[in-house]
Amino acid sequence: MRKLYCVLLLSAFEFTYMINFGRGQNYWEHPYQKSDVYHPINEHREHPKEYQYPLHQEHTYQQEDSGEDENTLQHAYPIDHEGAEPAPQEQNLFSSIEIVERSNYMGNPWTEYMAKYDIEEVHGSGIRVDLGEDAEVAGTQYRLPSGKCPVFGKGIIIENSNTTFLTPVATGNQYLKDGGFAFPPTEPLMSPMTLDEMRHFYKDNKYVKNLDELTLCSRHAGNMIPDNDKNSNYKYPAVYDDKDKKCHILYIAAQENNGPRYCNKDESKRNSMFCFRPAKDISFQNYTYLSKNVVDNWEKVCPRKNLQNAKFGLWVDGNCEDIPHVNEFSAIDLFECNKLVFELSASDQPKQYEQHLTDYEKIKEGFKNKNASMIKSAFLPTGAFKADRYKSHGKGYNWGNYNTETQKCEIFNVKPTCLINNSSYIATTALSHPIEVEHNFPCSLYKNEIMKEIERESKRIKLNDNDDEGNKKIIAPRIFISDDKDSLKCPCDPEIVSNSTCNFFVCKCVERRAEVTSNNEVVVKEEYKDEYADIPEHKPTYDKMKIIIASSAAVAVLATILMVYLYKRKGNAEKYDKMDEPQHYGKSNSRNDEMLDPEASFWGEEKRASHTTPVLMEKPYY
């Protein structure tokens, strides 16, 4: 057995060595045979044929002091590694022993920072009207809110009424228009519930007790059972009042109902269906609209505050550029701009409804008799039953740039990929709070990314290059803006960016390989398309090294696991005869092993055979 272990271990190490270094191959004789692909800063394929290297080779450009002007620098020629005539100077800001090349990888240093502003991805549902999922209640399918991010400042306006939407729905002898949208009183009282009351209520539930107030409110609302249907995946939405620290469960999931066919704005007709619409009103600025799917790490992955001194833009080969096509509206302040963005944002509102929704008497009787089956076709939500079920999946005009000087709100529907530092602008989204602002623009982002990429490429060069001349080679990333002009490795003197609170410099003498089209799409320029056609997703080739290292580690881990398994198997075989009593078989070691998976049932995941009844706690229901 020990011999088998040794053989397996040696085989694993041999395989790892072959992956990294090959078998019998001398890489030092061909240091550039499989090196990464880099083109010089200003190479335009204008060289003579003998100087046109294929994409998957690396060229070296020798820097030397030169009196040539910038136009001369536009036509640098490569040298080979056997002492061919050196190329003209590509840049003039560094020492003569420094060889600077420009990467051809068009990466975006903002990718991680801007992830929370990819609303289609992080929210995944409507914003103005959120009806992104379907759920069954008492045998019938209905729609319900499903956005993964909180919507700050969102509320419901009931037309021609002094009743707020957080008023409990009308019951008993109340007129229909005397009620609002909130859950009716229950025993014990489930809505509204203060933050302290919720903390106390869930103090023994380890899955809930430590959640933040918004996520806790969302989970609390999702704990209510609709129509006594314990098998239903339907979860009520909620609104959290940050000022009063209260969680209001919404009995009505509908967010918009307009038109004479479906509602009546006449205040005198107290028992007619009221008209309502979603809005970001000044009276709602402390409210946050929550669906059942609000993620517990929303503070990291969802936008909340607006960005001062910032303007959403598109990353275009080394710099953040303006979004060319926007819809411009007048707005006296940030609140008005945020409100406009919300009104134009993604919406799941149905476009057609059923005729039977005009049967006000049926709805009225449903409220009086607390008969959910009479009103659910209207309020779970309006137009959901046998109507079109349009789902936006978060696509819409969800972003805006507010110009504080011109008082213009620029709204667009393309996902921004970077931020422009501009003291005249505030960047906002439909999810964001209508007035809250953060001032911390990440000024050092560019410099940090440049240094990180240069260091990463330096390590790669040390592994693959055999430079005996002592020259220091630098692979500069395609980032042409920074608050440290020396970090740009620019062949000319960088220019100062105007209206920048970060004192940015931009390098403009390096030709850009991408551009923005009139429909807000970033594309590779025509003359460079052939070069990038062979590079999947434009990923840098140093990722291949990561894959090799990961593969090597995986082989070693698998070998270790196999050895442990064989050892345990041998031990178990020796103990097999001792396990002859039936009570030792199939018996769980702890109560936890006998419980159903709580998260799948309690948090409303896809219904499965063993996940139809919650096991963490008794769900209160009305």
Swiss-Prot record:
Keywords, sorted A to Z: Disulfide bond, Glycoprotein, Malaria, Membrane, Signal, Transmembrane, Transmembrane helix
Glycan-bearing residues: N162, N286, N371, N421, N422, N499
General function of this protein: Involved in parasite invasion of erythrocytes.
Highest taxon of the lineage: Eukaryota
Pfam families, sorted: AMA-1
Disulfide pairings: C149-C302, C217-C247, C263-C275, C320-C418, C337-C409, C443-C502, C490-C507, C492-C509
Segments in the Extracellular topological domain: 25-546
Any one of the GO BP annotations: adhesion of symbiont to host cell
Renumbered residue ranges of the record's region Disordered: 578-607
Signal peptide interval: 1-24
One GO cellular component term noted in the UniProt record for this chain: membrane
Gene name in the database record: AMA-1
Record field: compositional bias (Basic and acidic residues): 578-594
UniProt key word Signal: yes
Cytoplasmic compartment residues: 568-622
Main location: membrane
Protein family membership: Belongs to the apicomplexan parasites AMA1 family.
Entry-linked SMART domains: AMA-1
Positions of transmembrane segments: 547-567
Cellular location(s): Membrane
Protein name: Apical membrane antigen 1
